[in-house]
Each structure stands twice: as structure tokens, then as C-alpha cells.
Amino acid sequence: MASSGGELGSLFDHHVQRAVCDTRAKYREGRRPRAVKVYTINLESQYLLIQGVPAVGVMKELVERFALYGTIEQYNALDEYPAEDFTEVYLIKFMNLQSARAAKRKMDEQSFFGGLLHVCYAPEFETVEETRKKLQVRKAYVVKTTENKDHYVTKKKLVTEHKDTEDFRQDFHSEMSGFCKAALNTSAGNSNPYLPYSCELPLCYFSSKCMCSSRGPVDRASDSSKDGRNHHKTMGHYNHNGSLQKTQINSFKNSVACPGAQKAVTSSEAVDRFMPRTTQLQERKRRREDDRKLGTFLQTNPSGNEVMIGPLLPDISKVDMHDDSLNTTANLIRHKLKEVISSVPKPPEDKPEDVNTSHPLKQRRRI
């Protein structure tokens, strides 16, 4: 550092306030006009030099003002430092460097008791140990920031690859489901109303039957031959996707190939989709009647109020009050509650025709 006097306490070059930069672009200008000044770690310091403090005995107020930005270790006035008339120069040391940065940024060029403060770093007051510690802290911060940045870049790359894989799987699902739906649409007039033609959808049908083998026997000879033939067609259709897509298709073709077809051929939803409206209503009515008959058949309770399915739950254990009088009172209350619950009448189940006829017709207004 070059200095005008060459001794500690004289005016250093880095203490001089720079002029405001007039060549800065408009979009880069802030609310306050500033000079072009780059601070490296060797120029920053925990020591701050405050110039332009009015010489009216306001050291206490000055320290209280700077203490808002961090803990202050020491402060003193520099009487030998060259200053303007009727002003004083103070040196303040903060506990850490971050507090000194904030104090300099906030208090520089601020009005204080009628004077304009000029705050600058004073690294020349640091000892060798303080400088070594400052550099070590800065080095650790740089290492941590670099590691976080590398971790973020790696994570972003992994997320991008995972997103590409999910997009491919979603496209593959949609295309295969569309292929299965097209095969179901062309399978009108099949002898089995719950399944399409076996020659139209051998791959999906065979894979679904392999995954759900408990539903019934599978004709492995015919289905395997048809599956192989249609599998080559499907793989030929997706050859343009590249070697990566081929590997993914081979890895999960049994679990991903046609999940929509399994749901379509195993449930009656596919049948209802292509049935007329009247047939659907008749089917629903038949199901309701079957459920009603099944409920009547499962009524094992003589009272007919409950339907017993499966093992009975354990009864609620009675609480013992450890007193005959209290137990008698509790039993009376329980019996009374049972009588009240059993005596509540159930609302009559009226048919829709009866409900419609029970309401009186609205009379016309006489004019």
C-alpha cells in the first residue's frame, strides 16, 4: 500500500474517497451514486475508519449507532490522523468481518450531527494473526460455496436426466394405451364379450394374463407365438427412439407395456363403454337385484337388523366401578340407552311413485 506519509496514522490511498462514476450504464445505476471500487479480501477488514465526525463529543452516540450492525470489540479516537477542521477521526473494530461490511455499506455518506461521514476499511491496523485468520475464513467460505455449486450442477443434471426418462415413459404409456384402445375398438363382434380378438392385442393381453395368472388358465402356446410376432412389430415401431429407449423397453416391458389393457380386459368397464344406454340400465338394475338378494341371504341375525360378514368383533368390556351401587346405576343407564336406541322408528322406504303422488298439486292462481 502506498501512502502519502508512509507512517501509520497518515492518509493512505485506500482511505481517499473516490469520485462518483459518471460512465456507468443507466440500468446498472442504483439509488445512490457510487464510485467504481472493487474490494478483495486483503482490502476488507474488521477495522473501520470513520472520518468527518463533528468534534462535539459524540463518541458515545457514534458507537451506539455502529453497534446496530454487530458487536464492537474496541473503539478509540485517532488524534494524530489528519482531519478537517472541527472534525474527528475514530477507529472501530468489529467482532467479525460481515458486521464491518454491513456497517460500512449502511453508514458511508450518512449525515451524523450535521456532518457527512466517510467510512473506509483500515486493514493496516490488523496484526499478522488477524490477517491469517481472515484469509482462512475466506478460503473456507470459497471451498464451501464451490462445493455447493458443484452439488447444485450435479443435482440439476440428474434431475434433467430423470425428467427425460419420465417424459419417455409417459410418451410410451400414452402411445401403448392408444394402441390398446385402437385394438379394442376394432374388436366388435367377438365371441367373448369381455375380451377383444386375441390376434389384435396379443402383447398386452399376454402380459396382462401373465401378471394376473390367478384369474384363470392361459393358453401359453398360442399366446406366446402371437406375443412374439406382435412384439417384433412393436419394437420395429419404436426403433427410431434410439438405443436408450430400446434398453428401457426391454427392462420394463412386462410391467409397463400395457397396464391400461389389463384394466380394460379385467373389468366390466370396457363392456359398459360400448353398450347401449338401455342395456347399461338393465345391467345396473340386475346388479342391484343381485346385491339385494345377496344381502338377504347373508342376514344371519334373527332380528334382521344386521348383516354378519366375517368373524364377530369382541364385545365392549364393561367398566367395573368397584362399587355395587355404581355398577347398578351404570347398568340401568346402559339398558335405558339400548331401549331408547331400539325404540327409534325407521323412516318408511317409499317408492318414487308414491313420493310423487303424495305431494299435492300446486293450484293455479286465479286472475
Swiss-Prot record:
In this chain, the stretch annotated as Disordered covers: 217-243, 277-303, 339-367
User: Which GO terms are recorded in the biological process aspect for this UniProt protein?
Assistant: mRNA processing; RNA splicing
- Return the Basic and acidic residues bias intervals: 217-228, 347-356
Instruction: List cellular component terms (GO).
Output: nucleoplasm; spliceosomal complex
Mind listing the UniProt keywords for this protein, alphabetically? mRNA processing, mRNA splicing, RNA-binding, Spliceosome
Q: Which family does it belong to?
A: Belongs to the RBM48 family.
State the protein's name. Answer: RNA-binding protein 48
